[in-house]
């Protein structure tokens, strides 16, 4: 979701900030430090206790950014978290004991910023990040209006890109937002208008819809659905028989579920959960990025924070951040959830593991 939309939804935030003791490991040394924390955990079902401990806190591991998105855990070289900061057009990295550093400039747009005639704040940078089956960095690029692969090793990042998807039936995509790979190597992604300088009114908008797409191993871009007004976050169930898609529209703030057919297309679209009634000044944000654990729980960012659902759409609880919350990702040993929430990057220890670990 775009930062400007998120900030229109509400003002104010949770003021309580606590301290939690953590263990940092740097240069072989172990030391105890205190980290500030943010928000609270709202428990709506006793089953949430098997997912997150009663005393768990959301640690602030980074702050002061413009609009964070697209967290991705990279296991190589001791492990690091990559995440996008969209308005300044960059990716940052975080490592335990090292903190946050700039990883890549011009991550979503190779031209000058701010772009002319933009509706402030301009959001030209990368959004969601992923690793392809070969372990290469793949980016949803707002300004370049494409899904692209970085043409450089992860250890030596460069603003050099190879397009994977930039057009559909000869027309330029809007601004790819989120993506996920299937087990067979196919790429699924969403394409709302948030990265366009004038959003829906942009004169350079060539498609008259916002789509969900699949790129098969043959490289062809196939439209899966154009029924959603603002398709955004996207994730698979553990068995990849269900595809979840968030719709970041205040008038229809929903998460959809689709059956995935053997040929990779989708069918039987239905509303998984409707959060439209949550939208308002008390809860910042809209349905956005999401991830799934190995037990099938859906961790879906949306109004108020990160909402935890079981596979039957039962709402178990919410990690209430008090900020517009854009995305999340599992990392470290798989039982840590990293959360991007406006200017913050948060870390929450869980009792479950995400898929892929």
Residue ranges and their predicted role:
Residues 10-21:
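Bacterial N-terminal signal peptides
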Residues 21-30:
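Signal peptide processing junction and immediate N-terminal pro/mature segment
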Residues 7-8, 260:
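Generic cytosolic/nucleocytoplasmic N-terminal low-complexity/intrinsically disordered segments
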Residues 29-357:
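Sequence-structural signature of mature extracellular/luminal beta-sheet repeat domains
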Residues 1-6:
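N-terminal secretory signal peptides that target proteins for export/translocation
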């Amino acid at each position: 979701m775009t930062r400007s939309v998120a900030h229109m939804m509400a003002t104010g935030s949770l003021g309580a900030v606590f301290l939690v003791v953590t263990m940092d490991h740097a240069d072989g040394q172990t030391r105890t430090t205190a980290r500030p924390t943010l928000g609270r955990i709202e428990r709506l079902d006793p089953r949430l206790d098997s997912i997150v401990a009663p005393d768990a806190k959301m640690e602030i591991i980074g702050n002061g950014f413009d609009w964070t998105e697209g967290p991705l855990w990279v296991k190589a070289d001791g492990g690091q978290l990559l995440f996008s900061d969209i308005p300044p057009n960059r990716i940052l990295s975080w490592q335990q004991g090292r903190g946050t550093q700039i990883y890549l400039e011009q991550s979503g747009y190779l031209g000058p910023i701010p772009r002319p005639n933009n509706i402030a704040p301009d959001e030209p940078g990368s959004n969601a990040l992923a690793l392809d089956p070969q372990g290469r960095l793949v980016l949803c690029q707002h300004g370049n209006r494409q899904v692209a692969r970085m043409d450089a090793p992860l250890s030596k990042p460069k603003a050099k890109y190879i397009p994977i998807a930039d057009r559909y039936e000869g027309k330029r995509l809007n601004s790819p937002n989120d993506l996920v790979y299937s087990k067979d190597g196919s790429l699924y992604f969403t394409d709302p208008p948030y990265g366009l300088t004038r959003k829906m009114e942009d004169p350079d908008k060539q498609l008259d819809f916002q789509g969900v797409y699949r790129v098969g191993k043959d490289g062809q871009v196939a439209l899966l659905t154009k029924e959603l007004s603002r398709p955004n976050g996207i994730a698979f169930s553990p068995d990849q028989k269900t595809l979840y898609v968030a719709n970041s529209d205040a008038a229809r703030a929903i998460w959809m579920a689709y059956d995935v057919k053997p040929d990779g297309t989708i069918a039987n679209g239905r509303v998984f959960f409707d959060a439209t009634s949550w939208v308002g000044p008390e809860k910042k944000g809209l349905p956005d990025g999401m991830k799934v654990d190995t037990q099938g729980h859906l961790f879906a960012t949306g109004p108020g924070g990160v909402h935890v659902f079981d596979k039957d759409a039962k709402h178990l609880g919410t990690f209430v951040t008090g900020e517009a919350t854009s995305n999340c990702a599992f990392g470290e040993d798989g039982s840590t959830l990293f959360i991007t929430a406006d200017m913050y990057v948060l870390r929450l220890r869980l009792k479950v593991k995400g898929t892929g670990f």
